[in-house]
């Protein structure tokens, strides 16, 4: 087995089925080795699910690494835009699983961004009542957020991710070199989730992003700084997931910026904004809500907005009908007993969850955002 001393390892310390997030340049070539280290025995069948832009440069290398270690691997290529994140696409994955005769000992492996990871994870959760899944994210957003934690699912016309399941991966492998072929817009979208971790509990990470070269491309960050950002973000996500696997309480903080962000995605139409772009807009919106309540200072809200802009992300609220916004908010999956729950910033590095925000507060905030 090939030694891999350069790979960084982060434990997701779940009570049941703990796993590792493995980070390092060249990691994709050692994928088969890492499956063996994770206790996955050779001879098992693996359905690799990817999208065309990722499968072209990385699909064959992924299959080769798996086959060299004795796995029977096949590749399914699907369209993976946000508008394709539907039950119909999951059914296509199930069809391939049937054709490839995947058994309960078989695995699915997601090679791609957050949409591929979400759909592959959900397909694995529902095939034969659940088979193992491996996450190999190739976008920044998926690396720091979507691939870690076991949240899987697809969209419904009424809202984002309303159909889904918790299904933890057996391994997450992050190879930063795959970001070299990622379009810059998608890289910038992933930076929204990195900023989120700074707000949630890592002010040093937030300050790191404020300083030095503008963090709006992998090349601009440089290998060392990029791997540090990946490691700190993944570690932050792993800590929260380990403490609250199924979003019973603490894990809800990971939805910072997402409540308004999902409204933007839903009402503007899936695919109009990338997920991270919508989250960036949502963070600005919820920041304004917190300032209005007096729980956050205008100065720190301004720092957040400036950093979002520094990363090349949008901050302006789109022209949306306020009543449609309220209706969409009420359909959010985080609503509890009919009450909206928002993650509000209190300081850079500290947030709170509130369910006492009134309709009038939201409408006033929307008026301010529209300028």
From Swiss-Prot:
Note describing how the cofactor binds: Binds 1 divalent metal cation per subunit. Can use either Co(2+) or Zn(2+).
Cofactor: NAD(+); Co(2+); Zn(2+)
EC number(s) from the headed UniProt entry: 4.2.3.4
Annotated catalysed reactions: 7-phospho-2-dehydro-3-deoxy-D-arabino-heptonate = 3-dehydroquinate + phosphate
Residues noted as binding Zn(2+) in the record, renumbered to the chain: 193, 258, 275
Protein origin, superkingdom: Bacteria
Family annotation (InterPro entries): Dehydroquinate_synthase, DHQ_synth_AroB, DHQ_synth_fam, DHQS/DOIS_N, DHQS_C
Pathway as given in its UniProt record: Metabolic intermediate biosynthesis; chorismate biosynthesis; chorismate from D-erythrose 4-phosphate and phosphoenolpyruvate: step 2/7
Gene Ontology CC: cytoplasm
Binding-site list for NAD(+): 114-118, 138-139, 151, 160, 178-181
Alphabetized CDD domains for the sequence: DHQS
Annotated compartments: Cytoplasm
Cross-referenced HAMAP family: DHQ_synthase (MF_00110)
Function according to Swiss-Prot or TrEMBL: Catalyzes the conversion of 3-deoxy-D-arabino-heptulosonate 7-phosphate (DAHP) to dehydroquinate (DHQ).
Family the UniProt entry places it in: Belongs to the sugar phosphate cyclases superfamily. Dehydroquinate synthase family.
Name this protein carries in UniProt: 3-dehydroquinate synthase
Higher taxonomy: Bacteria, Bacillati, Cyanobacteriota, Cyanophyceae, Synechococcales
Gene symbol of the encoding locus: aroB
């Amino acid at each position: 087995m090939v030694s891999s001393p350069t790979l960084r390892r982060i434990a997701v310390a779940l009570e049941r089925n703990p796993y590792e997030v493995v980070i390092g340049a060249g990691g994709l070539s050692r994928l088969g080795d890492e499956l063996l280290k994770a206790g996955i025995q050779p001879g098992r069948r693996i359905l690799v699910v990817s999208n065309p832009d990722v499968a072209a440069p990385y699909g064959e290398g992924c299959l080769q690494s798996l086959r060299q270690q004795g796995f029977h691997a096949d590749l399914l290529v699907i369209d993976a835009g946000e508008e394709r994140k539907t039950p119909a696409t999951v059914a296509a994955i199930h069809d391939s699983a049937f054709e490839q005769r995947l058994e309960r000992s078989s695995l699915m492996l997601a090679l791609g961004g957050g949409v591929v990871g979400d759909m592959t994870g959900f397909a694995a959760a529902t095939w034969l009542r659940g088979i193992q899944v491996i996450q190999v994210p190739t976008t920044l957003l998926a690396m720091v957020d979507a691939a870690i934690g076991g949240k899987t699912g697809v969209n419904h016309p009424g809202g984002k991710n309303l159909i889904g399941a918790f299904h933890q991966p057996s391994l997450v492998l992050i190879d930063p070199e795959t970001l070299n072929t990622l379009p810059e817009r998608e890289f910038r979208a992933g930076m929204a989730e990195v900023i989120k971790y700074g707000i949630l509990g890592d002010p040093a990470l937030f300050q790191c992003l404020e300083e030095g070269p503008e963090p709006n491309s992998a090349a601009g960050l440089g290998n060392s700084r990029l791997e540090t950002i990946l490691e700190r973000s993944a570690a932050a996500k792993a800590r929260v997931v380990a403490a609250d696997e199924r979003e019973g309480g603490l894990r809800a903080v990971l939805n910072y910026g997402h409540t308004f962000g999902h409204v933007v995605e839903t009402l503007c139409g899936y695919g109009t904004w990338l997920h991270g772009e919508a989250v960036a807009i949502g963070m600005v919106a919820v920041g304004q809500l917190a300032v209005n309540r007096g729980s956050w200072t205008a100065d720190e809200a301004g720092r957040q907005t400036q950093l979002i802009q520094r990363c090349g992300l949008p901050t302006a609220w789109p022209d949306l009908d306020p009543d449609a916004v309220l209706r969409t908010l009420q359909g959010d999956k985080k609503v509890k007993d009919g009450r909206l729950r928002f993650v509000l910033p209190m300081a850079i590095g500290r947030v709170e969850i509130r369910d006492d925000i009134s309709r009038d507060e939201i409408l006033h905030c929307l008026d301010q955002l529209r300028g």
